[in-house]
């Protein structure tokens, strides 16, 4: 039963990932992406990593994929023109693909890491430790520096996205709150003697 479930989730994830790449409709591609995430979460459950599976569903399916779906549906993007512009980057994509395939071939071949690399490998967590506790011990004890660096990279990416999307238009009227707070009421207020039946 476990073998059948593994092949079911694995084939579903591979097919969904392939459909994401070749899909012509971006909305359909996002839906296939959600299926790929759910299949990967099922594989994590089979491996006994329920916490990681739940994180995958909540973060990727519940936030990222839904955000992609709303962006694709709400933005008026000419995908035909976009594909035409992306065609010029096809040679670079092929080079990167060949490099990745070569790296995968080296990783799955008879290559063995050096003794120094083996000494840096973390010792396995005790089997008696629960899944969530073991993950916390690995992240916050053995790889705490890498974890903090990953958070710093995400922070820089968030700040960069805000800076890139922030636009200042000169024709838009804005309030200077600090200037309004420090202004002198005697200079900003003016009393007028309005006569009856007349305006200013």
UniProtKB/Swiss-Prot annotation:
Its main location: membrane. Pfam families: Oxidored_q3. It comes from the Bacteria. The chain crosses the membrane at residues 2-22, 26-46, 51-71, 90-110, 144-164. It is a multi-pass membrane protein. It is found in: Cell inner membrane. This is NADH-quinone oxidoreductase chain 10. It comes from Paracoccus denitrificans. The gene is nqo10.
């Amino acid at each position: 039963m476990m073998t059948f479930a593994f092949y079911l989730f694995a084939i579903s994830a591979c097919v969904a990932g392939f459909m994401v790449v070749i899909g012509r409709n971006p909305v359909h591609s996002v839906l296939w992406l959600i299926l790929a995430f759910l299949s990967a979460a099922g594989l994590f459950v089979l491996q006994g990593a329920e916490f990681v599976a739940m994180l995958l569903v909540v973060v990727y399916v519940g936030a990222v994929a839904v955000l992609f779906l709303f962006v694709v549906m709400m933005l008026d993007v000419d995908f035909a023109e976009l594909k035409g512009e992306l065609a010029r980057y096809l040679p670079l994509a092929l080079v990167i693909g060949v490099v990745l395939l070569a790296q995968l071939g080296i990783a799955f071949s008879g290559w063995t890491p050096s003794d120094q690399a083996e000494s840096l490998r973390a010792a396995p967590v005790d089997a008696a430790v629960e899944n969530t506790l073991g993950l916390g011990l690995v992240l916050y004890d053995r790889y705490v520096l890498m974890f903090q660096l990953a958070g710093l990279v995400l922070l820089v990416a968030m700040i960069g996205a805000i800076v890139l999307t922030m636009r200042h238009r000169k024709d838009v009227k804005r309030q200077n709150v600090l200037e309004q707070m420090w202004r002198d009421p005697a200079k900003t207020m003016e009393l007028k003697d309005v006569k009856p039946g007349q305006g200013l």
